[in-house]
Every structure is written in C-alpha cells, then in structure tokens.
C-alpha cells in the first residue's frame, strides 16, 4: 500500500486532502526558511522561492522517513508545500504580529494578488528516492475591503497569523475575498490539479491513493 505523507502541519492542507479522499500520514517538516531564502539571493522570483522551500521541506521529511520510519519509506509519496502572497511588489508569508497583519490587509484591500504555492513531491520505494519533482501553482486572489471594525475583529481572531498573506479562503477571511482566478485549493495551500499531475508522473494514480489512504484517522508525528 502506497502511503501519502504530508510534510506539513497545516490544517488547511490536511483538510484539502481529506476532502479529496486521502487520509495522509502527517509529519511536519522542520526547515529554516530564512536560510533557504537567503541562499536564493535578492533577485529570486516568487515561483522559485516557494518551489525551493517546498522541495527542501519534502527532502527533510523524506530523510526522516528513511532514517526512522523505514516501513513507511518502503512505499510512500512525500508531499510538502510552501505558500506566499505576491502583491504590490512584495512577497508576503505569515505575518509576524497583529500589527504586521493589519498593515498587510490595508495594502491588500481592494486589490488583486497572486498566491504562489510550491509543491515538493518525493516518491520513496524500498527506502530510496525513485522520483523527485517540485513545481509551483499560481492563483489570483481578489481582495474585498473590510470595514475597520470587521478588520479588527478578524485580526483579534488570530487566524491571520497562521497563514501566508494573513488571510484564508476557507475560514473567517473568506468573508473578505471577492473572488479567485485559478484553482481555489491552491489558495488553501495545496493545488489538487498540480498534485494529481505530479503523482501521475511518479507512476501512481490518485485513485490508488484513495484506496490506500482513506478510512482511518490521520497519524500525526512531530
């Protein structure tokens, strides 16, 4: 049975997979994102930044599996992602504070931005890497303009501090999104169309992952 291993602690990504019929093994990745970004240099484009970060996260989780989870590493697909919002010439990750989230929302209101999600995929068989790929999906997000009181209520919820760009599509932040152009699941943190393509290229069908992963509670390891 081929397991899908999600290298992310993101509740949104887990929900996307569960709603799509997959119950993954969850092993959160531990990558120093600042170090990876610094190594890319100041001229790195958004698609490369998230793609390299996702690949690094997938590689770190794959190394963990081949070292301590060899039964799983005998036949699995590791999926890791990284999302950032590009708007007004700035690449935004998770806000570090409420004040930063407020500043981001004021700059986003009434504008459109591009949500970039890098996807890193590694196929492990017999504790060895047999396939590795990383690609980026892009979705345009059209932001509404929340009232001052609604924005403060949203910031007080704490949701903005947990997600790239300081907003969600599938949570409270969805009230302030006027629309998207492209795949909605990509905004939540994982593009199902891109993941389908990557999985098929490593020799698997998504239906095999449904049968192999659905039906039990998620097993989360930190």
Swiss-Prot record:
Protein name according to UniProt: Nucleoside triphosphate pyrophosphatase
Active site residues per record: 82 (proton acceptor)
Transmembrane segments: none
Broad class of where this protein is predominantly found: cytoplasm
Cofactor(s) in the UniProt record: a divalent metal cation
Group of enzyme by EC: hydrolase
Reactions catalysed: a ribonucleoside 5'-triphosphate + H2O = a ribonucleoside 5'-phosphate + diphosphate + H(+); a 2'-deoxyribonucleoside 5'-triphosphate + H2O = a 2'-deoxyribonucleoside 5'-phosphate + diphosphate + H(+)
Location in or out of the cell: Cytoplasm
Disulfide cysteine pairs (residue numbers): none
Pfam families hit by this protein: Maf
A GO cellular component entry from the record: peptidoglycan-based cell wall
UniProt record, GO biological process: nucleotide metabolic process
Functional description taken from the UniProt entry: Nucleoside triphosphate pyrophosphatase. May have a dual role in cell division arrest and in preventing the incorporation of modified nucleotides into cellular nucleic acids.
Sorted UniProt keywords: Cytoplasm, Hydrolase, Nucleotide metabolism
Miscellaneous section: Was identified as a high-confidence drug target.
UniProt EC number: 3.6.1.9
